[in-house]
Amino acid sequence: MAPEQPARSGIDFSAFRDPKLARELIERIHELVGDRTINLMEVCGTHTVSIGRYGFRSIMPAGLKLLSGPGCPVCVTANRDIDHAIALANIDGAIITTFGDMMRVPGSSTSLAAQKAAGRDIRIVYSPLDALDIAEQNPDRPVIFMGVGFETTTPTIAAAILEAEARGLLNFSVYCAHKTTPPALRAIANDPETTIDGFILPGHVATITGLAPFGFLVDEFKTPGVVTGFEPVDILQGICMLVQMVVEGQPAIDNAYRRGVNADGNPVARQLVEQVFEPCDTTWRGLGPIAASGLAIRPEFSRFDARTRFDVPVEATVEPRGCRCGDVLRGAITPSDCPLFGRTCTPEHPVGPCMVSSEGSCAAYYRYRN
């Protein structure tokens, strides 16, 4: 029923937006679900936005719930990390660089955007390599890149650190808040307050990791997962495959995004990451501390590690009152269940990070709520 997956070059995307194919998949999903109750979770910010844009939640069977999980790297960044980055901005002469979505995320008492308005030198970059250029142009000033993201963006950070070493840019460093996806999925699967019957697995992440790191979902929890693309037919195909596995009681990890994802991912990118980073424990917003779910810069590259290089006082962490971003991120509630949603918390005046990021669950729900 789904379109044949062509070679990566010269892809004709029209097949993945075909209304007839989409209708057939929707009808099949309705047939399979019947009067069952099935909860599926996507764990990719792009899927969050796409599901909202295409209105898929409103056309699914009544018993099929599509939940948003911890797929937005900005959203899962803990308040403590935001506060630490703000503290680094107070270093004399420091230049803080980061991606645009991080600017408005509230910390315990302020944000990077507010600190920039107050006179701190905080700059938006589109790549860590831009931060390297800034470091080269300002050799007498510390330039710190605040790095957040999952497996997709980590290789570029590793490459930037290696390039900084090659260019002798010792004034460059990275505040690393990177995370890895599989441990978070294990935490959700173990959460007694959530019931997830299947995972719409992130296509972007899987381009790096391949399929193997998600195998534990089946081995340990008998829960299926399907790596899914981002076009309408991609997503519907992934949902249909998951529902069929749930109904038939045959869980597996499958790939519905073969034009973008190889089963073994990108070994070269993974090797680059392993050269520069090592696993560490880290805290996720909503999920709390998760063992070996973060990445720390290896000791041999410690001169580029802003965490160990700069000893700065960080204020006591305070979570925003009433904000339920954490519950949204673990699938315990939907954004509309939060009492602040659409009232005191809007994209113009966000209380929590899920309303700040363009890929945040709350921002997507708000934008496509009608």
For each feature predicted by the language model, list its residue ranges.
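Secondary-structure boundary elements
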Residues: Q137-R141, E163-L170, D191-T195, T223, ...
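Flexible, glycine/charged-enriched surface loops at secondary-structure junctions
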Residues: T37-L40, N171-F172, E248-R258, W284, ...
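A conserved active-site cap/scaffold subdomain adjacent to cofactor or substrate pockets
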Residues: Y175, E193-N262
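Metallocofactor- and cofactor-centric catalytic cores in central/energy metabolism, strongly enriched
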Residues: A2-D140, T154, A158, L162-R167, ...
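Phosphate/pyrophosphate-binding betaalpha-module
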Residues: M146, F150-P213
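Short catalytic-loop micro-motif centered on adjacent basic/acidic residues
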Residues: L40-E42, R123, I144-G147, S173-Y175, ...
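Short beta->alpha junction loops/turns
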Residues: G45, F150, E231-P232
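Internal helical hairpin/lid segments
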Residues: L236-D327
